[in-house]
Structure formats: structure tokens, C-alpha cells
């Protein structure tokens, strides 16, 4: 059950307009942010289109019909629900401090209705996956431009000891100006100055795009840019050929032909 259109959050600061996507761990809404803009004419109230992601671990929770509060089915489920909610909040707060022209901007992280929400900028456009579904394989110059832009975004987060760990066409948006933007850091990891993991994450794999290190959770306990670089290469292969790459675990275990 989704939040209804017109539902308000943060005491009226945000208003839900409609659902734009959902998965096993969350629901994404388009919304409106009511804010003030100061200028030569004084302070003006304005509405800014935004995207709001709601943490909703659907296998373990449900929504009350009248209050819209998110409830967990069992105490066992509560442990997992809370664990990943805290991880989501922690990673979103990190991203709220990361500003790059090829990464979606996080505006705010907050808790309400028994769950967590991330308010972020709304990017008019479509994902590379949607573009491929509509147009087929993409021209090489266009692919190289997008890959270069996402590579710049990855270099930026890697310098801050952050791994994305889910690079794939559906997590790259192309905005109305034709610029690539990296989204969905839901399974990302952050590392300390000694390059040791400081945040745990669920083991989530996008087959064909995940590096072999990601098949063993210990493979990403120490910082290395290799998983993201592999996934970016797999994404480029997919965009140029229209084919999903062979899973890295199979490439590593199969004898060479």
C-alpha cells in the first residue's frame, strides 16, 4: 500500500503527488517541496518538484490503512527492518554531503510514519535502461560520453572512500539536458581513513553487472574501486551490444574457451 496522492510529510513541507517506482526495499514518489526563495522582490513562496524515497521493506512490513504508519509483522522482522533502516539513514546522510554534477543531490533525510524518507532532487529524464528499451543499442559516441561522466562521478565518491556497488543502466539517469546522473546509493559502502568498512550493507547483486568481489561479502570489506570500475565496464558493454554480460562468478570459474 502506497501513500496516497496529496499526502503531506514533515508538517506540510513536502507533498506526495504520485508513485514513480517501487521495489523490495522502498517506494519512490514524485513530490513537491514548499520552500521560500529570497530575492530583490522579497521572500516568495515556491513549489519545487522533488523525488521522495520511502523505506518500505515489503517482505517484513505493512502499512496501516488509517494512519499510514509502517508496521512490522514480527519481532524477528523488526531486527532486520531496523538494521537496514539505520543503514539507509546513515548512507543518505553521507550523500547529503556529496555534491557533484553527475550525482543526484540529496536534500534531507528524516523519519516519519515509523520509517525513513529521503528527499532528493527530481531529475526530468529517463534511465539508460529505459532509453535502451525504447531505442535499442546506443551510438558509441553517446555511450562514451555517458560512461566518462559516470566515471567522473565515481572518481569523486571513491576519493571520499565510498563505493556505489550497484552501477547498471537502470541506476543512471539522463536528464533533460543530456547529462548522465548517478542515482540509488542504497547498497553503497563507506570506508574509514584506513580503508576499512564502516557501514554494513545487504548483499544485493545485479547479475551481469556485479563484480566477483561482490559475490563474497568479505571481498568488499576493504576499500578498492575495482567493483565499481568492473560494473561501469559491464554497463558500457550492455549499452553497446544490447546484451547482459556473463556473470562475473561464471567468467571466473568457467575454463577458457
Q: Where do the language-model regions lie?
A:
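AlphaC helix of the eukaryotic protein kinase fold
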Residues: 62-97
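Activation-segment/catalytic-loop signature of the eukaryotic protein kinase fold
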Residues: 109
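Protein kinase glycine-rich loop
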Residues: 17-23, 28
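Catalytic-loop of the protein kinase fold
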Residues: 158-174
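Conserved activation segment of eukaryotic-like protein kinases, specifically the C-terminal portion
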Residues: 198-214
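Activation segment signature within eukaryotic-like protein kinase domains
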Residues: 146-147
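Conserved short submotifs of the Hanks-type protein kinase catalytic core
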Residues: 113-127, 131
Amino acid at each position: 500500500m502506497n501513500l496516497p496522492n496529496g499526502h503531506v510529510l514533515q508538517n506540510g513541507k513536502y507533498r506526495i503527488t504520485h508513485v514513480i517506482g517501487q521495489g523490495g526495499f522502498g517506494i519512490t514518489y514524485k513530490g513537491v517541496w514548499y520552500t521560500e526563495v529570497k530575492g530583490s522582490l522579497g521572500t516568495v513562496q515556491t513549489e519545487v518538484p522533488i523525488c521522495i524515497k520511502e523505506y518500505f521493506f515489503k517482505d517484513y512490513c505493512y502499512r496501516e490503512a488509517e494512519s499510514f504508519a509502517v508496521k512490522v509483522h514480527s519481532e524477528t522482522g523488526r531486527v532486520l527492518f531496523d538494521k537496514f533502516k539505520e543503514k539507509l539513514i546513515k548512507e543518505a546522510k553521507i550523500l547529503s554531503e556529496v555534491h557533484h554534477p553527475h550525482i543526484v543531490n540529496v536534500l534531507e533525510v528524516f523519519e516519519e510514519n515509523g520509517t525513513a524518507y529521503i528527499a532528493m532532487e527530481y531529475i526530468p529524464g529517463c534511465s539508460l535502461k529505459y532509453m535502451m528499451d525504447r531505442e535499442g543499442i546506443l551510438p558509441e559516441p553517446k555511450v562514451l560520453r555517458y560512461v566518462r561522466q559516470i566515471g567522473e562521478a565515481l572518481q569523486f565518491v571513491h576519493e571520499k572512500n565510498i563505493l556505489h556497488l550497484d552501477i547498471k543502466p537502470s541506476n543512471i539517469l539522463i536528464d533533460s539536458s543530456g547529462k548522465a546522473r548517478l542515482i540509488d546509493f542504497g547498497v553503497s559502502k563507506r570506508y574509514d581513513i584506513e580503508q576499512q568498512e564502516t557501514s554494513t550493507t545487504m548483499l544485493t547483486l545485479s547479475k551481469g553487472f556485479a563484480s566477483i568481489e561482490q559475490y563474497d561479502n568479505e571481498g568488499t570489506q576493504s576499500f578498492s574501486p575495482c567493483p565499481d570500475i568492473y560494473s561501469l565496464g559491464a554497463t558500457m558493454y550492455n549499452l553497446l551490444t544490447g546484451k547482459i554480460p556473463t556473470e562475473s562468478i561464471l567468467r571466473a570459474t568457467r575454463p577458457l574457451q
